[in-house]
């Protein structure tokens, strides 16, 4: 009987967050759809083979590939939150619950805190992913290694009097490699690693007793991944910067939405002087 009542309370608790779950699911679907099924519009793409900004060498083996980026960002950030809430509870600040929304009866403070933390993190990841994917398609900027990806047809170039060409001169048979060359801005690696490591750093500083030195690995890891994208000729410097800016904006909005500082409600009004 008690277990049935507990299950009902948890169901009612999760219903309070249906809207957030829907956003996470919808944004994840939109991101996957944009990555798998959509490509940037190539009709208006024009480029010069003499442009040094897109004439870097194509590097097949990236320092940090897509899978490694997902593990370092999504996997590592969730693991830090889960591990701290489950096994390092002594590091959690006593007043952490005051920053959360009101907890229904029958739901423990520990569970409420862990659920809210992971919920905020997943909102950040999914919204950031959807926005990044959409912006890549809309902007359609060329990567630094685009010419090498394109493999220009020398015969078509010699038959043309123009110094500016379109995608029709590309001999690249692997369309995935070619179309990925049109999705430079913003950097997905940058937005993913900054959004997750930014949250992880902020979460540890706000809700745990870990000092700055113990959390400095978060921004350092993000910086390493960002620099690797420039070294691999996958992005221009402004691509990784724009990805980081987008990530910070998403962190700010989701943090404000999820965590509500209720401490001010507990402050008594100032006494009225007569």
Curated annotation (Swiss-Prot):
Where are the annotated segments for Phosphatase sequence motif I?
A: 136-144
Alphabetically sorted, this entry's keywords are: Golgi apparatus, Hydrolase, Membrane, Transmembrane, Transmembrane helix
Q: Transmembrane residues, as ranges?
A: 16-33, 70-87, 118-139, 190-203, 215-231, 238-255
Q: Which SUPFAM superfamilies match?
A: Acid phosphatase/Vanadium-dependent haloperoxidase
Question: Which protein is depicted?
Answer: Lipid phosphate phosphatase 1
Positions of the region Phosphatase sequence motif III? 228-239
Q: Which organism is it from?
A: Saccharomyces cerevisiae (strain ATCC 204508 / S288c)
Please give the Gene Ontology molecular function terms for this protein.
diacylglycerol diphosphate phosphatase activity; lysophosphatidic acid phosphatase activity; phosphatidate phosphatase activity
Topology feature Lumenal, residues: 1-15, 88-117, 204-214, 256-274
- Database matches in CDD domains: PAP2_containing_1_like
EC class name = hydrolase
- Relate the protein's function as given in its record: Catalyzes the dephosphorylation of diacylglycerol diphosphate (DGPP) to phosphatidate (PA) and the subsequent dephosphorylation of PA to diacylglycerol (DAG). Together with DPP1, regulates intracellular DGPP and PA levels which are phospholipid molecules believed to play a signaling role in stress response. Can also use lysophosphatidic acid (LPA) as a substrate. Substrate preference is PA > DGPP > LPA.
Q: Which Enzyme Commission numbers does its entry carry?
A: 3.6.1.75, 3.1.3.106, 3.1.3.4
SMART domains for the chain = acidPPc (SM00014)
Q: Where is this protein found? A: Golgi apparatus membrane
């Amino acid at each position: 009987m008690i277990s049935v009542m507990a299950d009902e309370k948890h169901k009612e608790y999760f219903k309070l967050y249906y809207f957030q779950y829907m956003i996470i699911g919808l944004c994840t679907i939109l991101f996957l759809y944009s990555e798998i099924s959509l490509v940037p519009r190539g009709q208006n793409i024009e480029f010069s083979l003499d442009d040094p900004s897109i004439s870097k060498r194509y590097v097949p083996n990236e320092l940090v590939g897509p899978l490694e980026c997902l593990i370092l960002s999504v996997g590592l950030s969730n693991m830090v939150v889960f591990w701290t809430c489950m096994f390092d509870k002594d590091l959690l600040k006593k007043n952490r619950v005051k920053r959360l929304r009101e907890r229904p009866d029958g739901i423990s403070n520990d569970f409420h805190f862990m659920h809210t933390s992971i919920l905020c993190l997943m909102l950040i990841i999914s919204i950031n992913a959807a926005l990044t994917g959409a912006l890549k398609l809309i902007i359609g900027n060329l990567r630094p290694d685009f010419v090498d990806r394109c493999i220009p047809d020398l015969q078509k170039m010699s038959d043309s009097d123009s110094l500016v060409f379109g995608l029709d001169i590309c001999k690249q048979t692997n369309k995935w490699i070619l179309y990925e060359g049109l999705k430079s801005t913003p950097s997905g690696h940058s937005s993913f690693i900054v959004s997750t490591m930014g949250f992880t750093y902020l979460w540890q500083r706000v809700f745990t007793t870990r000092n700055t030195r113990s959390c400095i690995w978060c921004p350092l890891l993000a910086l390493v991944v960002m620099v690797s994208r420039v070294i691999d000729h996958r992005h221009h410097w402004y691509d990784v910067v724009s990805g980081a800016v987008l990530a910070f904006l998403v962190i700010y909005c989701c943090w404000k939405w999820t965590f509500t500082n209720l401490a001010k409600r507990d402050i008594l009004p100032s006494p009225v002087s007569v």
